[in-house]
C-alpha cells in the first residue's frame, strides 16, 4: 500500500518556524501553496523580462513537492540546513528520504515523482528557491506587522538577502516593486465587492 496520500495530508501537521513564537502558526502545506503561487508569478515576470519560455508544469510541480521530505525531517530553518558542518549530511539525509518516500507507488507515478523531486533544471530550482525565500520574507513581514518582535531580526536578515538577490535577478526586483513595497497591505479593500 502506498503512503503518498497520507504524506500529502501529514504535511499539514508539520509546523514551520518551530522554536519561534508566531501569531499565525504555519505548516508545510500552507507554505507549499504560497511557494507555488509565488513561483508562478516569478516565472511570468522572468518570461516577460527575459523573453524566454519556462516549463510551467515542471516548475509548479517542483514547487508543490519542494519540501515533501519534511514529512520525515520536519522543518529545519535555513541557517541550520546551510551550516557548513551540517549542509552535506543534511542533503544526504534529504536524498535518502526522497528515495524512500514513494517506494510503493505504481511505477509510472513513482517515476514521475522521482523526476519531479530530482529535477535538474537549474533555472526551475532557482525560481523555486527564490519563491521559498520570498515566502519566508512575507511570513516575517506579517509577524512583525502584528507586533512580533521575535521576527524583527529575521525580517531584516531575509530582507537584506532579498535586496542583494534583486541586484542580480531583474524578475525578483520587479516582484519586489509590484508586491512587497507595502506588504502586508493595511487596507484590504479587495475583500469587499464595492
UniProtKB/Swiss-Prot annotation:
It comes from the Bacteria. It catalyses: 4'-phosphooxetanocin A + H2O = oxetanocin A + phosphate. InterPro entries: HD/PDEase_dom. Mg(2+) binds at residues 31, 66-67, 132. Oxetanocin A binds at residues 17, 75, 78. 4'-phosphooxetanocin A binds at residues 16-17, 75, 78, 81. Belongs to the 5DNU family. This is 4'-phosphooxetanocin A phosphatase. The lineage of its organism: Bacteria, Bacillati, Bacillota, Bacilli, Bacillales. The gene is oxsA.
Amino acid at each position: 500500500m502506498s503512503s503518498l496520500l497520507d504524506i500529502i495530508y501529514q504535511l499539514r501537521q508539520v509546523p514551520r518556524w518551530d522554536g519561534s513564537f508566531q501569531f499565525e502558526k504555519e505548516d508545510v502545506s500552507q507554505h507549499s501553496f504560497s511557494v507555488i503561487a509565488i513561483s508562478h508569478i516569478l516565472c511570468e515576470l522572468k518570461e516577460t523580462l527575459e523573453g524566454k519560455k519556462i516549463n510551467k508544469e515542471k516548475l509548479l510541480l517542483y514547487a508543490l513537492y519542494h519540501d515533501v521530505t519534511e514529512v520525515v525531517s520536519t522543518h529545519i530553518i535555513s541557517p541550520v540546513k546551510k551550516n557548513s558542518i551540517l549542509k552535506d549530511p543534511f542533503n544526504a539525509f534529504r536524498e535518502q528520504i526522497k528515495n524512500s518516500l514513494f517506494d510503493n507507488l505504481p511505477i509510472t507515478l513513482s517515476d514521475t515523482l522521482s523526476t519531479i523531486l530530482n529535477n535538474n533544471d537549474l533555472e526551475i530550482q532557482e525560481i523555486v528557491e527564490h519563491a521559498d525565500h520570498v515566502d519566508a520574507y512575507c511570513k516575517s513581514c506579517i509577524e512583525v506587522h502584528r507586533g512580533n518582535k521575535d521576527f524583527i531580526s529575521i525580517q531584516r536578515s531575509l530582507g537584506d538577502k532579498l535586496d542583494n538577490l534583486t541586484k542580480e535577478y531583474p524578475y525578483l526586483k520587479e516582484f519586489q516593486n509590484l508586491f512587497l513595497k507595502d506588504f502586508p497591505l493595511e487596507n484590504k479593500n479587495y475583500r469587499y465587492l464595492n
